[in-house]
A protein has these predicted regions:
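Acidic, proline/glycine-rich low-complexity IDRs
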Residues: 1-37, 47-51, 56-166
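Short amphipathic beta-strand starts and helix->beta connectors
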Residues: 38-42
């Protein structure tokens, strides 16, 4: 039993060290949580290096990683992401996304961020997206799996004004 403990600690130490290295090099790290219910991806380092809330998206890792990567690249180009407006971060013909504040206290579930930032409470925004048919999570016709997954981190905001694209 005692022999297993050092290996667990060393795994956590390596993960923490890798996170700090990536944050210093790139200004952030993307952390996938494939076994989350639902799966999700979040950032660590935006609050330190960009003075911007951390980001989280409830999506399978293969979908969530590129979504957050594009959002971070937009930040690095000077776009400030905020709750409310619609954004098209990829191309003009892509589905818009929106951000909403993560509910108070839920950031404590982002354990690696808590360890690196030395706090369980920090500002974070959830990236919200539509289902394949273009329905937002608050739309009753939205795919239930997409709608439910996105209710994990924030109170579903009111529908955006469709002419507010950035």
């Amino acid at each position: 039993m005692d022999q297993a403990l050092p290996s667990l600690v060393s795994v956590a130490d390596r993960q923490h060290s890798r996170t700090l290295t990536e944050m210093r090099q790139y200004g952030f790290r993307l952390c996938p949580v494939p076994d989350g219910r639902p799966p999700y991806v979040y950032t660590i380092g935006l609050s330190l290096y960009s003075q911007h809330p951390e980001l989280v998206v409830s999506a399978p890792v293969a979908v969530g990683l590129p979504m957050l990567r594009q959002a971070v690249w937009a930040l690095q180009r000077g776009v400030r992401l905020a709750p409310g407006p619609l954004y098209r971060l990829w191309r003009a013909d892509t589905t818009p996304i929106q951000f909403a504040p993560v509910r108070a206290g839920l950031t404590r579930a982002l354990s690696l961020a808590c360890a690196v930032l030395h706090t369980r409470y920090f500002a974070a925004l959830q990236l919200l997206y539509t289902d394949a048919a273009g329905h937002w999570p608050w739309d009753p016709t939205c795919d239930p799996a997409i709608s439910q997954a996105q209710r994990r981190w924030c109170a579903v905001p009111r529908p955006p004004h469709l002419d507010e694209y950035l």
